[in-house]
């Protein structure tokens, strides 16, 4: 099976569109003054919209998330899917609340079970389809709680079929339409 996990070099460096960052920050009830960790800074789409105090990790800058051990109030990020189990495991040691955007099929019953065993529960979920991304995604907000919440807030949002990086019509991950983003990979207007 050719999954991200099994590839010699995983291709899971996917930059978060600014519009999705805005949705994430609003959805997770991020408050100014919270000490926030962005653990996959990339080009700064999330990090640049956070107010102080804030910290980041970025493997390309030698700041490995797995070497970060300082407690924070909240983690907001788009983690790499190829190492998601270990990523969650380390997340549980750093905060009492996190907001991640992950592929819909990455939120498996086993992952939720392990999350709950570590005292974390999903309190909010937002389902969306991001044009040019492979699959639907969940924005999940998880909090460390004494017991499972009685209700979970669930929402969905339709982001249309225009690329969130450059505004052009998008055919998803297949076909000729995706090339408009790859050509602009180094431009600031398009973060793909």
Regions found by a protein language model. Give the residues of each.
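Class I S-adenosyl-L-methionine-dependent methyltransferase catalytic core
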Residues: 1-192
